[in-house]
Amino acid sequence: MGDLIRSSASTPENYSSDVVALFEENGSRPENLTAMVNYYRALVRGGGSSRQRKLGFPKIETPTLMLWGEDDMALSMATTFGTDAHVSDLTLRYFPGISHWVQQDAPVEANAMLKAFLAGDAVPQYASLQR
């Protein structure tokens, strides 16, 4: 698990041995690993998504912040396209050069965006937060 995390990260140096050990510990328990991959299984198995499309998706009315790493090896940016049709108040921020692990690969920028969003302020773009 630790090798997967570090090899898929944009900034492997941000993953201390302690953090990787937590991923490995949590991922080594069968019940935890099952929970960790069920989201992806549901995407692949299908059925639920197409069934829900036929029934209609209720629009999400809660203000929503989506932070997305453009270099995510598990989920492409295309996954986010059209999300605004299902979320009335969506703020979407892309992180160029950042992997699936946005909060670890770009913690300063992700936290600045979360802080602004939770305060009701304008959420900055990733590029404007670069040091």
Question: Can you say where each PLM-predicted feature lies in the sequence?
Answer:
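Short, flexible loop/turn segments with low-complexity composition
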Residues: V19, N38, R53-K54, V123-R131
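Residue-level signal for the nucleotide or nucleotide-sugar donor/cofactor binding architecture
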Residues: S28-E31, L75, D105
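Helix-rich cap/lid subdomain of alpha/beta-hydrolase
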Residues: M1-R51
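Catalytic active-site module of serine/aspartate enzymes centered on a nucleophile-bearing elbow/loop
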Residues: D89-R131
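Short alpha-helix in the alpha/beta-hydrolase fold that links the catalytic acid
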Residues: V19, Q52-R53, S76-T83
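Serine-hydrolase catalytic core
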Residues: K54-E61
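Acidic catalytic loop of the alpha/beta-hydrolase fold
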Residues: G47, D71-L75
